[in-house]
């Protein structure tokens, strides 16, 4: 288990912060792995996207990188992305993420088992952004989009300066569909994001390398090839009866793509 923060600059005034947490296992089906937050710094303020497990002083790490006031956003409110929220007071999420909030307050297994230092009760408040909002950081703007599928109100950000899309868990090499929505709805959300454009690379929360904008096409192709016969048990979440389907043989491969879903949701995958 990684015990300290690690950060690196992915572009001028743009940082990836790898939070303390479980490192991924090798091979085709690594575990949940580390969580990466992103810090986007403008002339007047900064955005922090996600807060990790909450088991270390993320605020101090952020303050070591910028002295600007920080707007804290959650791409979604799963505990590995919102665990450090209490360090920031007010946290912004998409309006569509309201329905995900209630079940996600700490402590929640298996997160409690993974990290025994999380707070039992939140002492922060959520504020809500609308899809299409543009956040002005001073000489740098960040657009807020919705890309539902992993959760009903998953937020992605497009940064005008770098033309990076920060995807949280909405676009990853292995996406878990947990919103209770049809696979076709996730596909439509991907198509909507692709049509919006304005980005050249995708930075997700559980992989340290960027995915090119064309990675969306790889996920769309995977969805179009979906068949129940190609699905298999997802070993990283056997206790939760998760299934998966994928292209590629190893997670580390550039073109690897996988989608996981609950076994009980097979009918949703066919709609």
Task: Label the predicted regions.
Residues 6, 191-271:
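Accessory terminal helices/loops
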Residues 131-158:
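Core dinuclear metal-dependent hydrolase active-site scaffold
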Residues 39, 155-170, 185, 190-199, ...:
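Metal-dependent phosphodiesterase/nuclease catalytic metal-binding core
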Residues 5-64, 156-172:
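Conserved beta-strand hairpin/beta-sheet module of binuclear metal-dependent hydrolase folds
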Residues 48-51, 69-80, 92-96, 146-149, ...:
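Active-site neighborhood of phospho(di)ester-bond hydrolases with catalytic His/Asp-centered motifs
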Residues 53-136, 173, 224-236:
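Active-site HxH/HxHxD metal-binding segment of metal-dependent hydrolases
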Residues 28-29, 53, 105, 176-181, ...:
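Short, solvent-exposed loop/turn segments at secondary-structure boundaries
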Residues 143, 170-179:
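Surface-exposed cleft-lining segments at the edges of enzyme active sites
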């Amino acid at each position: 288990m990684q015990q300290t923060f690690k950060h690196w600059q992915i572009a001028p005034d743009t940082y990836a912060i790898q939070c303390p947490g479980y490192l991924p296992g090798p091979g085709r089906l690594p575990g949940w792995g580390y969580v990466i937050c992103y810090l986007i710094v403008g002339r007047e303020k900064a955005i922090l996207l996600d807060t990790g497990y909450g088991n270390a002083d993320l605020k101090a790490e952020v303050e070591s990188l910028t002295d600007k006031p920080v707007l804290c956003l959650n791409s979604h409110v799963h505990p590995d992305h919102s665990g450090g929220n209490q360090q920031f007071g007010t946290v912004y999420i998409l309006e569509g993420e309201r329905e995900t909030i209630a079940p996600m307050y700490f402590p929640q297994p298996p997160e409690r088992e993974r990290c025994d230092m999380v707070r039992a009760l939140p002492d922060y408040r959520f504020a809500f952004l609308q899809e299409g909002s543009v956040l002005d950081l001073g000489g740098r703007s960040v657009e807020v989009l919705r890309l539902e599928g992993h959760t009903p109100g998953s937020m992605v950000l497009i940064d005008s300066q770098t033309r990076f899309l920060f995807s949280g868990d909405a676009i990853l090499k292995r996406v878990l569909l947990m919103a209770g929505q049809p696979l076709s709805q996730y596909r439509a959300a991907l198509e909507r994001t692709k049509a919006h454009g304005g980005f050249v690379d995708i930075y997700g929360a559980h992989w340290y390398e960027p995915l090119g904008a064309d990675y969306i096409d790889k996920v769309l192709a995977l969805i179009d090839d979906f068949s129940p016969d190609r699905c298999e048990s997802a070993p990283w979440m056997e206790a939760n009866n998760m299934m998966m389907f994928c292209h590629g043989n190893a997670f580390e491969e550039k073109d690897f793509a996988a989608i996981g879903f609950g076994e009980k949701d097979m009918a949703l995958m066919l709609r």
